[in-house]
């Protein structure tokens, strides 16, 4: 007993081995079981449900993001093809417009040349007719002049 007094331990201390120690152990086990069944399991279930919910939402968000990226790529492809098609249509329209302009210009030139040629031929015809008429009138006048000169003599 002298050895125990030397370290300052007395009877009835913290680590006395008697019936209190097993009773405390049983209380700790019972408290652990009660806390586990009443508090930790429901909280754990709620945490697991929340983790599953978050995990499912993350997976769903990743899937939707993947789908959005795919749709964006498809739309960009469609936009590029639409732009190419629009450029092709504009180019064709410009070519058609140029072609129609050239055809209209050529037609107008041909009509102008035809009108000019027709007017030239008409002028030549009228000039020729006027010369013929003048020639006939000159013949008639010269005959008259000759007749008068002959008669006056």
UniProtKB/Swiss-Prot annotation:
User: Per its UniProt entry, which superkingdom is the organism in?
Assistant: Bacteria
Compartment(s): Cellular thylakoid membrane
Quick check: keyword Transferase in the entry?
no
The annotated topology with respect to the bilayer is: Single-pass membrane protein
* Disulfide cross-links: none
- Any transmembrane segments, and where? 23-40
Asked if the keyword Membrane belongs to this entry, the reply reads yes
Role according to the record: F(1)F(0) ATP synthase produces ATP from ADP in the presence of a proton or sodium gradient. F-type ATPases consist of two structural domains, F(1) containing the extramembraneous catalytic core and F(0) containing the membrane proton channel, linked together by a central stalk and a peripheral stalk. During catalysis, ATP synthesis in the catalytic domain of F(1) is coupled via a rotary mechanism of the central stalk subunits to proton translocation. Component of the F(0) channel, it forms part of the peripheral stalk, linking F(1) to F(0). The b'-subunit is a diverged and duplicated form of b found in plants and photosynthetic bacteria.
Family recorded in the similarity comment: Belongs to the ATPase B chain family.
The protein depicted here goes by the name ATP synthase subunit b'
Q: Which organism is it from?
A: Prochlorococcus marinus (strain MIT 9301)
Gene this chain is encoded by: atpF2
């Amino acid at each position: 007993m002298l050895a125990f007094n030397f370290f300052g331990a007395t009877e009835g201390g913290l680590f006395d081995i008697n019936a209190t120690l097993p009773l405390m152990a049983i209380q700790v086990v019972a408290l652990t079981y009660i806390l586990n069944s009443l508090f930790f399991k429901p909280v754990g279930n709620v945490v697991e449900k929340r983790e599953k919910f978050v995990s499912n939402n993350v997976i769903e968000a990743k899937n939707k993001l993947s789908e959005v990226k795919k749709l964006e790529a498809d739309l960009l492809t469609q936009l590029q093809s639409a732009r190419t098609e629009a450029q092709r249509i504009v180019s064709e329209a410009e070519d058609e417009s140029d072609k129609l302009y050239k055809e209209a210009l050529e037609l107008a030139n041909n009509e102008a040349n035809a009108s000019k040629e027709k007017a030239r031929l008409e002028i030549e015809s009228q000039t020729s007719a006027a010369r013929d008429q003048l020639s006939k009138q000159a013949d008639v006048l010269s005959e008259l002049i000759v007749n008068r000169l002959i008669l006056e003599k």
